[in-house]
UniProtKB/Swiss-Prot annotation:
Catalyzes the addition of L-lysine to the nucleotide precursor UDP-N-acetylmuramoyl-L-alanyl-D-glutamate (UMAG) in the biosynthesis of bacterial cell-wall peptidoglycan. It comes from Streptococcus pyogenes serotype M4 (strain MGAS10750). Its EC number is 6.3.2.7. Its main location: cytoplasm. It catalyses: UDP-N-acetyl-alpha-D-muramoyl-L-alanyl-D-glutamate + L-lysine + ATP = UDP-N-acetyl-alpha-D-muramoyl-L-alanyl-gamma-D-glutamyl-L-lysine + ADP + phosphate + H(+). This is UDP-N-acetylmuramoyl-L-alanyl-D-glutamate--L-lysine ligase. The keyword Nucleotide-binding applies. Belongs to the MurCDEF family. MurE subfamily.
Length: 481
């Protein structure tokens, strides 16, 4: 429960309070109301709900529906003049985060918080950290792929970083379940729209940066994207940073006065020997590590997670065991066809991650290589040119372009746009299952491989704003083995 007096105090301390308006006029103080629930969904309110009117597309009709259901007061940046009191604020998203934090009893203070950011690798690094910490603690995890609040039950996440009301409700449930640590993926969008406003992490990890999520409904420029990624560093007590990433020198200057540790080529924490399923490291994680996920970049993700978990209480033995146990749905999953050709299923969904995926496969498979690829509709339009650029740099690759969450766009138009950036013929088969079946039929020898990129473990396609059932890349590939 939270009282009107408590929430006004929170807003005033954050300099985010304008006034309370009701039929009697302007009020600096207000009293007599308390709330047992928080919501931003007008369909889920009653007389004991504190409602947040948020979003550029919010309509007064939503508020009228809530009032019909008994709503007594709402928080908003706008007075909709509907006859009930309104708490006016300058920034509704910041208000949501701080009020949710207090409403749920500040659960962030009862958990050790570990956050990963980066253009790619967040989910893999989070899984590594989860398995490391699980050896001696009770970690919860909020991940793009899966979320667990109790270490037993896993469910699919809707957002990389949940909305603040949901985030703190989930944190509170983690505390109730006896969890000791929370591992989170924190997207640039989470900072852009203040989902984690006011939250300080015990350790923040910056894995890498490359142009992505740049478009009309995401970040207008790379500078804006990079800036919002860096906010995790400002909001972490200690940081772990990849010294091999672009713009590392800037980040090193930024965190000079913070507790920090670097890994990668310009640091003391490096991978010295790398094999397909093992690596040796020097520095704070010195030793031998077995790993199920192939690729040097996955080994670096394991290093990043290990350095973070070391600070959070994990032992080197915990880290070694955790790395050896980690598998990630839809990340570098490998199948073998009856003719011994390989099928690789991976979530690679931007130019940089595609380049790394192709390089790893080419290192191990020297025959015919078939790539199945698409790009999502109505988001991340810059990826299409990036995909074309990467494919152009791999001339021995045979490419079939297909649907990958086309949303409100025509998947063939998206494929044609990708193809326009490739200086050789490619095939377009918009039906993703047919594309996979054809590619697999063309691989006949053990040295051949099919690479299915983009969707990973997703068992749906996003079409016209809706999730449409799709068997999933791994299930389809398994069917045609």
């Amino acid at each position: 429960m939270i009282t009107i007096e408590q929430l006004l105090d929170i807003l005033k301390k954050d300099h985010n309070f304008r006034e309370v308006l009701d039929s009697d006029g302007y009020h600096y103080h207000y009293q007599g109301l308390s709330f047992e629930r928080l919501s931003y969904d007008s369909r889920q309110v009653d007389g004991k709900t504190l409602f947040f009117a948020k979003g550029a597309t919010f309509k007064a009709d939503y508020l009228k529906e809530a009032i019909t259901n008994g709503l007594q007061l709402y928080i908003s940046e706008v007075d909709y003049e509907l006859g009930i009191p309104v708490v006016l604020v300058t920034d509704i998203k910041k208000a949501m985060s701080l009020i949710a934090m207090a409403f749920y009893g500040n659960p962030q203070e009862k958990l050790k918080l570990l956050a990963f950011t980066g253009t790619k690798g967040k989910t893999t690094a989070a899984y590594f950290a989860y398995h490391m910490l699980k050896e001696s603690y009770k970690p919860a995890m909020f991940s793009t792929m899966n979320t667990t609040l109790d270490g037993k039950t896993f469910f699919k996440s809707q957002l990389t970083t949940p909305e603040s009301l949901d985030l703190f409700a989930m944190m509170a449930e983690c505390v109730t379940n006896g969890m000791t640590h929370l591992i989170m993926e924190v997207s640039s969008q989470a900072y852009l729209v203040d989902r984690v406003y006011g939250l300080t992490f015990d350790v923040g990890v910056f894995l890498n940066i490359s142009p992505d999520h740049i478009g009309p409904i995401e970040h207008p420029t790379f500078e804006d994207y990079f800036y919002h990624k860096r906010l995790l560093m400002e909001n972490s007590r200690a940081v772990v940073i990849n010294s091999g990433m672009d713009h590392f020198s800037f980040l090193a200057d930024q965190v000079a006065d913070q507790e920090h540790v670097f890994y990668g080529p310009l640091s003391d924490n490096q991978i010295t020997t790398s094999q397909a399923f093992s690596f040796e490291a020097k520095g704070q994680l010195a030793g031998h590590y077995d790993i199920q996920l192939i690729g040097h970049f996955n080994q670096e993700n394991a290093m990043a997670a290990g350095l973070a978990c070391l600070r959070l209480g994990a032992s080197l033995a915990d880290i070694q065991k955790g790395i050896a146990k980690t598998r990630v749905p839809g990340r570098m999953e490998v199948l073998t066809m009856t003719n011994h050709a390989k099928v690789f299923v991976d979530y690679a969904h931007n130019g940089d991650s595609l380049e790394k995926l192709l390089s790893v496969v080419e290192e191990h498979q020297t025959g015919k290589l078939m790539l199945i690829l698409g790009a999502p509709g109505n988001k991340g339009e810059s990826r299409r040119a990036d995909f074309g650029r990467v494919i152009h740099q791999h001339p021995n690759l045979t490419v079939i372009l297909t649907a990958d969450d086309p949303n409100f766009e025509d998947p063939e138009d998206i494929s044609q746009e990708i193809a326009s950036h490739i200086a050789r013929p490619v095939e377009i088969i918009s039906d993703r299952e047919q594309a996979i079946q054809k590619a697999m039929s063309l691989c006949q020898e053990a040295k051949d491989a099919v690479i299915i990129a983009g969707k990973g473990a997703d068992a749906y396609q996003i079409v016209k704003g809706q999730q449409v059932a799709y068997a999933g890349d791994l299930a389809i590939a398994t069917h045609y083995l």
